[in-house]
Amino acid sequence: MQVTTEAVSGVARRLNVSVPTSRINEQFEARLKRTAKTVKINGFRPGKVPANVVRREYGASIYQEVVNDIIRDSVFEAIQQEKINAVGTPNIEKVEHKEDALVFEATVEVYPEVEVKAFDGLEVERKTAEIKDADVDTMIENLQKQRQTWAVTKGMAKKDMQVTFDFEGSIDGEKFEGGSAEDFKLVLGSGRMIPGFEDGIIGMKAGEEKVIDVTFPEDYQAENLAGKAAQFKITVKQVEKPKLPEIDAEFLKIFGVSEEEGIEKLKADVRKNMEREVRNGLRNQVKQAAFDALVAANEIEVPAAMVAQEIDRQRQQMVQQFTQQFGGAGAQSFDKSMLPDELFKEQAERSVKLGVLVSKVLADAKLEVDQARVDAYIDDMASSYEDPTEVIEYFKNDAQQRAQIEAVVLEDQVVDHILASAKVTDKAVSYEDLLKEQQARRMG
């Protein structure tokens, strides 16, 4: 077998393969003999069919099978012979039967060979944050709000109060579907309703009626209402103000704090959890910033096969998330057309490029996972659970789960390696702003 290789692009090679006709003939004759032993043809006993009859009846199909098998086998032999780091399935082209050889072309994508630029040209912003006493107080107040009750008031409705009311909407004097409800409960300031709706209720008291004018947003989900002016008749039935629970023994017990330990122990526990959250948030932020800089500084071409595989992985991940949220029945209604490739392509390309670059950084720097950092990562994560020892043992005994942690830690080591040479600018942010950034990153 003869093979020549030419570069089609940075991530594709064209193989010109020539297979001797003698190889095809040998396999063809061998397969004819095997077929003759098992084939059933009227007028002949099994295994006694003459070779010329088998050749006449089955020769063409057997020959094509042999050719297909030889092309399949020889293309992979050629890839190994040429030491090509192939990805995806080869594309066979221009098959030609010559007198002395079967000649064909095969195009195959290859794993990118890249050189990573020096890190001293990278600019990375690294956020810093610290937990202040006011942040802890706000968090404890949020814990109280999660368990708040409502107390009826005769006063005017204000922001953060809960109002029970009836409403009836109309456009140009005509009622519309979904525009009416009775005993509807709404916390003012929650942003659940269209702009202007909640503002129109502020200041009303129980027993009062009012007509408010609002306009549906241009991008409202119901197209028949989008951008239209509407009137809503509001009848307030009840106004309630929030009542936070006292920080007493019963409240402290919810969080595993005794009355003797008191509010200071609760604050200490809350601060500890917030500090862990900040550490994780800052680590993820600087990792994102470093990797963004790495990808931006190194324009590389990646194989379409790798991108397609990553698109499928991300699509499957989204379906799994949907299943967890809405149950298996909802996921079964999904089909590929609902989640087209274009939805994932940009992120998939970035992910593949980043993976190639990180692998190269690991190889160049000869980085290996730091098991001490893996243990520290697991310890920190386990400390948020009721029984940390059980969590630590779980990761100790489950190699697959530990491998996932090792992958995260190894990424952290790559980030540290990049930051050691990059131009790093520290920027202090508040705890609240850090949380907002994390939420925005998760949502998009």
Curated annotation (Swiss-Prot):
PROSITE patterns: FKBP_PPIASE. Keywords: Cell cycle, Cell division, Chaperone, Cytoplasm, Isomerase, Rotamase. Its EC number is 5.2.1.8. InterPro entries: PPIase_dom_sf, PPIase_FKBP_dom, Trig_fac, Trigger_fac_C, Trigger_fac_C_sf, Trigger_fac_ribosome-bd_bac, Trigger_fac_ribosome-bd_sf, Trigger_fact/SurA_dom_sf. One of its GO terms (biological process) is cell division. Pfam families: FKBP_C (PF00254), Trigger_C (PF05698), Trigger_N (PF05697). GO terms for cellular component: cytoplasm. Residues 160-245 form the PPIase FKBP-type domain. It catalyses: [protein]-peptidylproline (omega=180) = [protein]-peptidylproline (omega=0). It comes from the Bacteria. It is found in: Cytoplasm. Gene3D superfamilies: 3.10.50.40, Trigger factor ribosome-binding domain, Trigger factor, C-terminal domain. GO terms for molecular function: peptidyl-prolyl cis-trans isomerase activity; protein folding chaperone; ribosome binding. PANTHER family: TRIGGER FACTOR CHAPERONE AND PEPTIDYL-PROLYL CIS/TRANS ISOMERASE, TRIGGER FACTOR-LIKE PROTEIN TIG, CHLOROPLASTIC. Involved in protein export. Acts as a chaperone by maintaining the newly synthesized protein in an open conformation. Functions as a peptidyl-prolyl cis-trans isomerase. Belongs to the FKBP-type PPIase family. Tig subfamily. Consists of 3 domains; the N-terminus binds the ribosome, the middle domain has PPIase activity, while the C-terminus has intrinsic chaperone activity on its own. This is Trigger factor. The lineage of its organism: Bacteria, Pseudomonadati, Pseudomonadota, Gammaproteobacteria, Moraxellales.
